[in-house]
């Protein structure tokens, strides 16, 4: 199992990242311990197939598919004739079997030390295994690592050609994938090739193909081609066709069979910590391992004085709690002292939320039928192969046991990004943490809140910028100032304004309603929603002298309503200034579709990316007509100064950018 020397506890495979503990960063070791597992592998296919039934981000689905890692291939049996033992190997490339020139076992393989007995290599093998187990599997499996290993002094028989090939123990082979044993084909596998070179082992080509990046012989070659140096009945065939025939032949000879393998391993839930749910098991000298009966659940944690990590569970010291009676025979027994990984609790907490006050059961099935599955779940992508996978497994297992009517917990998933600073995750150790109090004291809570939502797409990481907060602060100040100015006008004597300006401002306000509502509804695109309100406020500023007071008032009321979720304080006050009413009592605005229809629109005209003019154009104008209108704009003509454009970029409905040298 994976062992964290800092936290003094075991870790699930999913909690090891690049060979280190995902919680504290310590380099993970491998130890042999008796631990408890949940058999998540029984659900591997369903966990894969049902990803197609949920509305989740594709990257999260891909991460789960890769973690489950379903592979179709063959199980081939190699035999150590000296000891009479068989060693099955899973391979997705049975077409390369004739190229196997050595055999490798993972350091954790139970037969490594036994195979070395009596060969004179016992000590070297034992020392190598000890060193290898101190390294995490994430680091060991890296393709770029220097290959190390020790010969066991034994050979096994290659079942397809009868060759005796030497057996090694090497840490680049992982026990958690396949059977912990591999047939090494250095001519067609990069890691096997590196090992063969390091130990001067034979390298044989069995697939003919072109590899300009290989050695002088074009090896290692991992592509497709035709079989060579294999067997007369297979040589000359395309390797993908021969692959199927080789498996059929192996089955007929009793030397192999079709097989499916998974990268996923059973979930190790034992933890040597105090804080966790006690594992409800007792150990009886007479009855063995006995589950705690339902009427004695839950097993409660005892009160202890010292729960610091000690290499074994702190509960082991609570002898009054450990010593108990066997539920079967009534004799003396001991409780299991490991506790469950806290991911066990987070795998079903959402079910308890539906019926949190129930003192008789975890939940009432009728209540869960009404509430489950969760319609919208929000969480970090870092939980893709941890909490999100475990929760799916729990729901499927509980459904199979008759406790649930649904087997997928979360119908829709949204994964939020992280706000970084100077390109790095904020942390006290890096000294790059932004103080919320300092931001609020300087710019106000609304500016801080709105900027966090405006900083970028909510599902992407974004870098913090103090200048960005200032920009949002200026926008909110402008909204307040314009609202105060309009509110100060006497409505009775207010100017009617230019009809075209009024129409444009009302249209812009309704466009903002439609845009913000759509962005917030399902996409959570708060950044573009805020940008739309900014556009509306900018339009009020631009048309301040030409639009009538009623149009300006409507636009500013709309801006306050739309910005209320992002900046509730200033918008509440601005709306009250304009209307005398409380904003939180108002319904969400709805767009008037009729105002959004128009025969013309204002085309932005740029020269070298800078705004130089605006012209009114027909809504159905072609790209050629838009280019001609922009070229004829008076201020564009001034800045062109007789020069011919190098390039003209036309974006219908928005702008024309004329590029000149």
Describe the residue ranges of each PLM region:
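Structured ligand/cofactor/substrate-binding pocket environments in proteins
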Residues: 60-65, 91-224, 255, 259-267, ...
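Helix-rich, typically C-terminal accessory recognition domains appended to large enzymatic cores
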Residues: 1-7, 70, 258-287, 389, ...
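Glycine-rich, small/acidic residue-mixed loop/short-helix segments
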Residues: 179, 616-642, 646-653, 657
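Acidic, glycine-rich two-metal-ion catalytic cores of nucleic acid-processing enzymes
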Residues: 308-344
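NTP-handling and nucleic-acid-processing catalytic cores
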Residues: 1-208, 310, 314, 325, ...
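Residues forming anionic-ligand binding surfaces in small-molecule and nucleic-acid pockets
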Residues: 221-229, 354-375
């Amino acid at each position: 199992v994976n062992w964290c020397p800092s936290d003094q506890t075991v870790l699930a495979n999913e909690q090891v990242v690049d060979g280190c503990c995902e919680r504290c960063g310590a380099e993970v070791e491998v130890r042999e311990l008796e631990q408890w597992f949940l058999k998540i592998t029984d659900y591997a296919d369903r966990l894969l197939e049902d990803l197609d039934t949920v509305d989740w981000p594709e990257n999260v689905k891909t991460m789960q598919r890769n973690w489950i890692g379903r592979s179709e291939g063959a199980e081939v049996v190699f035999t150590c004739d000296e000891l009479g033992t068989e060693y099955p190997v899973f391979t997705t490339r049975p077409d390369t079997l004739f190229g196997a020139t050595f055999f490798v076992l993972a350091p954790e393989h139970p037969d490594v030390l036994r195979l070395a007995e009596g060969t004179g290599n016992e000590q070297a093998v034992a020392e190598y295994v000890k060193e290898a187990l101190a390294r995490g599997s994430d680091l060991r499996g890296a393709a770029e690592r220097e290959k190390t290993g020790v010969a066991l002094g034994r050979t096994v028989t290659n079942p397809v050609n009868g060759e005796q090939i030497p057996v090694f123990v090497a840490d680049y082979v992982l026990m958690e994938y396949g059977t912990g044993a591999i047939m090494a084909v250095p001519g067609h596998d990069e890691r096997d090739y590196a090992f063969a070179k390091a130990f001067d082992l034979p390298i044989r080509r069995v697939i003919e193909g072109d590899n300009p990046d290989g050695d002088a012989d074009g090896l290692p070659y991992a592509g497709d081609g035709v079989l060579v140096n294999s067997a007369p009945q297979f040589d000359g065939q395309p390797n993908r066709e021969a692959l199927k025939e080789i498996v059929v032949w192996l089955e007929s000879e009793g030397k192999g069979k079709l097989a499916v393998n998974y990268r996923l391993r059973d979930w190790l839930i034992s933890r040597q910590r105090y804080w966790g749910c006690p594992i409800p098991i007792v150990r009886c000298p007479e009855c063995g391992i006995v589950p705690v009966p339902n009427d004695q659940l839950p097993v409660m944690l005892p009160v202890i004085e010292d729960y610091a990590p000690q290499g074994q569970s702190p509960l082991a010291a609570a002898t009054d709690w450990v010593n108990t009676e066997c539920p079967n025979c009534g004799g003396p027994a001991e409780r299991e002292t490991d506790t469950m990984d806290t991911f066990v609790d987070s795998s079903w907490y959402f079910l308890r939320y539906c019926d949190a006050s129930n003192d008789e059961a975890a939940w009432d099935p009728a209540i869960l039928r009404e509430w489950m599955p969760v319609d919208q779940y929000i969480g970090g992508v870092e939980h893709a192969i941890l909490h999100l996978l475990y929760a799916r497994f729990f729901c499927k297992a509980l459904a199979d046991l008759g406790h649930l009517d649904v087997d997928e917990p979360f119908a829709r998933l949204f994964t939020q990004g992280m706000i970084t600073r100077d390109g790095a995750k904020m942390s006290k150790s890096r000294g790059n943490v932004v103080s919320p109090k300092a931001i609020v004291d300087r710019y106000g809570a609304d500016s801080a809140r709105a900027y966090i939502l405006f900083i970028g797409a909510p599902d992407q990481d974004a870098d913090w910028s103090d200048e960005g907060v200032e920009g949002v602060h200026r926008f909110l100040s402008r909204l307040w100032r314009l609202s105060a100015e309009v509110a100060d006008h006497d409505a009775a004597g207010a100017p009617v304004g230019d009809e075209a300006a009024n129409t444009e401002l009302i249209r812009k306000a309704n466009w903002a309603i439609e845009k913000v509502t759509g962005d917030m509804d399902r996409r959570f695109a708060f950044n573009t929603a805020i940008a739309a309100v900014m556009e509306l406020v900018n339009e009020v500023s631009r048309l301040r002298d030409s639009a009538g007071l009623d149009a300006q008032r409507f636009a500013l009321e709309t801006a306050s309503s739309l910005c209320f979720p992002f900046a509730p304080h200033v918008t509440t006050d601005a709306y009250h200034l304009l209307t005398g009413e409380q904003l939180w009592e108002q319904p969400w605005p709805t767009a008037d579709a009729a105002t959004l229809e128009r025969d013309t629109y204002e085309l932005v005209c740029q020269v070298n990316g800078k705004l130089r003019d605006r012209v009114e154009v027909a809504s159905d104008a072609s790209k050629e007509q838009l280019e001609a209108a922009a070229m004829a704009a008076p201020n564009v003509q001034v800045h062109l100064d007789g020069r011919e454009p190098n390039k003209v970029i036309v974006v219908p409905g928005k702008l024309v950018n004329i590029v000149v040298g």
